From Swiss-Prot:
Signal peptide: none annotated. Residues 1-146 form the MGS-like domain. It catalyses: (6R)-10-formyltetrahydrofolate + 5-amino-1-(5-phospho-beta-D-ribosyl)imidazole-4-carboxamide = 5-formamido-1-(5-phospho-D-ribosyl)imidazole-4-carboxamide + (6S)-5,6,7,8-tetrahydrofolate; IMP + H2O = 5-formamido-1-(5-phospho-D-ribosyl)imidazole-4-carboxamide. NCBIfam families: PRK00881.1, purH. GO terms for cellular component: cytosol. Its EC number is 2.1.2.3, 3.5.4.10. This is Bifunctional purine biosynthesis protein PurH. Keywords: Hydrolase, Multifunctional enzyme, Purine biosynthesis, Transferase. Pathway: Purine metabolism; IMP biosynthesis via de novo pathway; 5-formamido-1-(5-phospho-D-ribosyl)imidazole-4-carboxamide from 5-amino-1-(5-phospho-D-ribosyl)imidazole-4-carboxamide (10-formyl THF route): step 1/1; Purine metabolism; IMP biosynthesis via de novo pathway; IMP from 5-formamido-1-(5-phospho-D-ribosyl)imidazole-4-carboxamide: step 1/1. Belongs to the PurH family. The IMP cyclohydrolase activity resides in the N-terminal region. GO terms for biological process: 'de novo' IMP biosynthetic process. It comes from Nostoc punctiforme (strain ATCC 29133 / PCC 73102). The keyword Cytoplasm does not apply.
Length: 514
């Protein structure tokens, strides 16, 4: 008897070629539902509609098509269990040897502007996941394909193994099937959580899933295997970036690129550039042009910039490209790259050059693994509002000082705590990152700034527990400080600022970064 394949897909890419090979090369019979059956029929292929095979018509406007014992019995039957075979024979059910199914485009639907809840709900597949899970469960006896990218590999398996896919292939396909349904259900749960958020006090379940995008050479270190996963079915963020040149991206490249993106997303109105090393900015600056912004960022700490990750919020032009080629860089990302600039950058073929049109959109949550679970928090994407800042010293800020304070505050937000940033002329002069005491970070930032600290601004991501940081800053020539406040000894720091003639502004918002 000919083997039986069930084909029911929303994405019909490659389905005709697959079906033709199944029929002509391997003597499969085909059963199919809805639009897939029509597509096969239009292509001149012999196909039996699911409704004709089961004897039950599609009902509820197509909501029930494949949910039938003749379908699921054929999928779930164990060929090495006599009672299962007897049950099939008694109910005139043929065993199904191949299931090809992909799911309604739920994520694509909810991504459309103005889509209603009713429209979204109608794109929640029921029969598809049921078949996908059933066939994945029974991998010992049949194969399941849920992605057109699997079709050629499956056919090659049949050609090399006398018409039967290997157990290894079936196991991999089953794992992909379960991963696909998990990701699909996660997308639905997240979408409905957002939809129903007004009366959900909290989310009791949090599911994290993704599709493997790329195996990375290694993780942070060569002994750590690593993989890059994409969330959702539609590429977004770095999965949507275009690599114009250079080697494959590494784990550390991607981590640093994301750190660079977060900083550059703070600045939209003015050309901005940042250079990242080990997720911290060694130089960030604004300029009248993107070329000027990059040069200022580079000169802020040219030593640390070597081997850095550069992010720009404007297209790369020829002038900027020429500057970029003057030192060794790991990666450069910008919204786009002009043709002449690309020719210039090509002279440094090892530099990874990427374009990503949307550098401002990032994940809404951050997730960290801990022993026995993981932690989830909303992203620190609060927008700085200077109208809510409190000037706590006798000296009031000028408009220019307020703009500089805002720049320093935005950069400091993305430096590892304890974080101190010294700036002037919308350019970082010194960055103190990751120290175990705040005054230690102050000293590092001031040492980097050197003589340029005179007349500069200092930002701190957390409050000052003592007035020593204020006095150290004043001794180096700092004239204004922005910090969140909230210490029991705020009055000591404010008094020191007044005594030393400094301006101090409290934001009321802390930006720890661990």
């Amino acid at each position: 008897m000919a083997r039986l394949a069930l084909l029911s897909v929303s994405n019909k890419t490659g389905i005709i070629d697959l079906a033709r090979s199944l029929v002509e090369e391997f003597d499969f019979d085909l059963i199919s539902s809805g639009g897939t059956a029509q597509a096969l029929k239009d292509a001149g292929l012999p196909v039996t509609k699911v409704a004709d095979y089961t004897g039950s018509p599609e009902i509820l406007g197509g909501r029930v098509k494949t949910l039938h014992p003749r379908i699921h019995g054929g999928i779930l039957a164990r060929r090495d269990v006599p009672q299962d075979i007897t049950d099939l024979e008694n109910n005139q059910i043929r065993p199904i040897d191949l299931v090809v199914v992909n799911l309604y485009p739920f994520e694509e639907t909810i991504a459309k502007p103005g889509v209603t809840l009713l429209e979204a709900v109608e794109q929640i597949d029921i029969g598809g996941p049921a078949m996908l899970r059933a066939s994945s469960k029974n991998f010992a006896h049949l194969a399941v394909l849920c992605d057109p990218a699997q079709y050629d590999e499956y056919l090659e398996e049949l050609r090399q193994n006398n018409g039967v896919a290997s157990l290894e292939f079936r196991q991999k396909a089953a794992l992909k099937g379960f991963s696909h349904t998990a990701s699909y259900d996660q997308a639905i749960a997240q979408a409905l959580t957002c939809q129903f958020a007004s009366y959900l006090a909290d989310t009791q379940q949090y599911t994290l899933s993704g599709t493997q995008l790329q195996s990375l050479r290694y993780g942070e270190n060569p002994h750590q295997p690593a993989t890059w996963y994409q969330t959702g079915t539609t590429p977004t963020g770095w999965a949507a970036a275009t690599k114009l040149q250079g080697k494959e991206l590494s784990y550390n490249n991607l981590v640093d690129l994301e750190a660079a993106r977060r900083i550059i997303a703070e600045f939209t109105d003015t050309p901005a550039a940042t250079i990242i090393k080990h997720t911290n900015p060694c130089g960030t600056a604004l300029g009248s042009s993107i070329s000027e912004a990059y040069k200022k960022a580079f000169n802020a700490d040219s030593t640390s910039a070597f081997g850095g990750i550069v992010a720009l919020n404007r297209p790369i032009d020829a002038a900027t490209a020429s500057e970029l080629t003057k030192t060794f860089l790991e990666c450069v990302v910008a919204p786009s790259c002009e043709a002449e600039a690309q020719e210039i950058l090509a002279k440094k073929s090892n530099v990874r050059v990427l374009t990503l049109a949307d550098l401002s959109s990032g994940p809404k949550d951050t997730v960290k693994a801990i022993a026995g679970g993981f932690l989830v928090q909303t992203a620190d994407d609060i927008v700085a509002d200077t109208s809510q800042w409190q000037v706590v010293t006798e000296r009031q800020p000028t408009d220019s000082e307020l703009a500089e304070l805002l720049f320093a505050w935005k950069v400091c937000k993305h430096v590892k705590s304890n974080a101190i940033v010294v700036t002037s002329d919308r350019t970082t002069l010194g960055v103190g990152a990751g120290q175990m005491n705040r005054v230690g970070s102050v000293k590092i930032a001031l040492e980097q700034a050197g003589e340029k600290a005179k007349g500069a601004i200092l930002a701190s991501d957390g409050f000052f527990p003592f007035d020593d940081s204020v006095r150290t800053a004043a001794a180096a020539g700092i004239t204004a400080i922005v910090q969140p406040g909230g210490s029991l000894r705020d009055k000591d720091s404010i008094k020191a600022a007044n005594d030393l003639g400094l301006l101090m502004v409290l934001t009321g918002v802390r930006h720890f970064l661990h």
